């Protein structure tokens, strides 16, 4: 069952209860104002993620990820090098792309090179999940939880950078220990040539420009970052228009070169070129995920209005030390999806220092690495490497993953 279905139903039931209860006390205006507030929060998140997903889909359609995958597969790396390379790239790419896309890309490389070695696949997938979650924790563009903290205004964009070292430690410590169990042999090399489609590199530059625009709107104009992201979507739309208008000239030029070189394969490939369509990229966004976020926002917002989150907040952030409360948020993120957990914390809005907001951002972001079901990356990889990367295969390494947290607390709290 898709994850959006139960939360959409739950959101509807909660707000029916709210509507009935507040009507009994003649406070329909209070319920309506709360509903509109939650809808606005969701709209900002929806449009922001829609633009980011559209850019990722555009890069995928232009064969950027396929080219990276072919390069890695064709290099003939040994298992140990492949283990470190896929993990390192997951850590580096996830702050720009989202951690789910990054994890799936690296998993595809692992499966193509060593799909017949289940022990290595399991270790490599665990490593990728840890790296992708850790890499996404120090960038608002790498993880939904980090994005929500930034959009809420608790931490400025530049203030996330102190999370880089703790995130790196959180990845490197378990990776170093797991690498000891990776075989020293080499898998069979597969050579595959992938040609980038026209405009691939320029779309990457436009995505970087879009990120800069979103940050500028937030830092300089004090507008929500989503306004800058929507402007960035216009960059892609105009570039898509340019690609379509110049397609005929580009094909004629490439066809002439193919004829001159006697390359029949290139001519055949040119005949199947499909014009770039931005709106098709929009339609291929992860709509189940986007609808899931709606359910989460509305469920948590409803429970907050009914007073349940205030009770939890009084226990966690009044009776407990905020540091340990935030550590528990990370542990809870391993069992429950980290998005509703973080949104609940943001809705509670406890009075905390910037250091504690950074701590809860890190723990919620990387806490999901403790279990395979704790993050979208882990769940997706269990499907991509079905039967080889499993819940219990990941669970065996949970104590090792937890060691990555030990050096992190003093760094953040200090």
UniProtKB/Swiss-Prot annotation:
Keywords: Antiport, Cell inner membrane, Cell membrane, Ion transport, Membrane, Sodium, Sodium transport, Transmembrane, Transmembrane helix, Transport
Subcellular location: Cell inner membrane
Main location: membrane
pH note: Optimum pH is 8.5-9.0. Inactive at pH 7.0 or 7.5.
Signal peptide limits: none
Pfam families hit by this protein: CitMHS
GO BP annotations listed: sodium ion transport
Domain of life: Bacteria
GO cellular component terms, semicolon-separated: plasma membrane
TM stretches of this protein: 6-26, 39-59, 77-97, 120-140, 162-182, 203-223, 224-244, 289-309, 327-347, 364-384, 392-412
Membrane-related topology note: Multi-pass membrane protein
One MF term in the entry's GO annotations: antiporter activity
Family, as annotated: Belongs to the NhaD Na(+)/H(+) (TC 2.A.62) antiporter family.
Protein task: Na(+)/H(+) antiporter that extrudes sodium in exchange for external protons. Can also transport lithium.
The name this protein goes by in its record: Na(+)/H(+) antiporter NhaD
């Amino acid at each position: 069952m898709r994850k959006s279905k139960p939360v959409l139903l739950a959101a509807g039931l909660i707000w029916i209860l709210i509507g009935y209860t507040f009507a009994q006390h003649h406070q329909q205006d209070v319920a309506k104002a709360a509903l509109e507030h939650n809808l606005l929060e969701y709209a900002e998140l929806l449009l922001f993620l829609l633009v980011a997903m559209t850019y990722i889909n555009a890069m995928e359609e232009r064969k950027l990820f396929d080219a990276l995958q072919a390069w890695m597969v064709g290099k003939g790396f040994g298992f140990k090098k492949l283990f470190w390379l896929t993990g390192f790239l997951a850590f580096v790419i996830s702050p720009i792309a989202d951690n789910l896309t990054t994890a799936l890309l690296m998993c595809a490389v692992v499966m193509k090179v060593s799909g017949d070695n289940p022990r290595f696949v399991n270790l490599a997938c665990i490593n990728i999940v840890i790296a992708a979650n850790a890499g996404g924790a120090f960038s608002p563009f790498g993880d939904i939880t980090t994005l929500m903290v930034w959009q809420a205004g608790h931490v400025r964009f530049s203030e996330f950078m102190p999370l880089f070292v703790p995130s790196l430690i959180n990845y490197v410590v378990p990776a170093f220990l797991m690498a000891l169990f990776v075989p020293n042999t080499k898998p069979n090399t597969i050579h595959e040539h992938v040609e980038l489609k026209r405009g691939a590199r320029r779309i990457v530059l436009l995505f970087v420009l879009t990120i800069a625009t979103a940050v500028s709107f937030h830092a300089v104009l004090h507008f929500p970052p989503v306004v800058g992201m929507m402007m960035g979507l216009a960059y892609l739309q105009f570039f898509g228009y340019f690609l379509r208008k110049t397609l005929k000239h580009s094909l004629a030029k490439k066809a002439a070169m193919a004829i001159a070189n006697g390359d029949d394969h290139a001519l055949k490939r040119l005949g199947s070129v499909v014009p770039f369509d931005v709106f098709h990229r929009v339609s291929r966004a992860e709509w189940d995920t986007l609808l899931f976020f709606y359910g989460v926002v509305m469920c948590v917002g409803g429970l907050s209005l009914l007073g349940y989150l205030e009770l939890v907040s009084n226990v966690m952030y009044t009776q407990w030390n905020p540091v340990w409360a935030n550590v528990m948020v990370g542990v809870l993120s391993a069992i429950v999806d980290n998005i509703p957990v973080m949104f609940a914390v943001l809705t509670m809005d406890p009075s905390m220092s910037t250091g504690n907001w950074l701590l809860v951002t890190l723990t919620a972001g990387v806490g999901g690495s403790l279990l395979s079901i704790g993050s979208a990356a882990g769940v997706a990889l269990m499907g991509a490497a079905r039967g080889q990367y499993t819940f219990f295969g990941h669970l065996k390494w949970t104590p090792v993953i937890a060691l990555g947290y030990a050096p992190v607390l003093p760094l953040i709290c200090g």
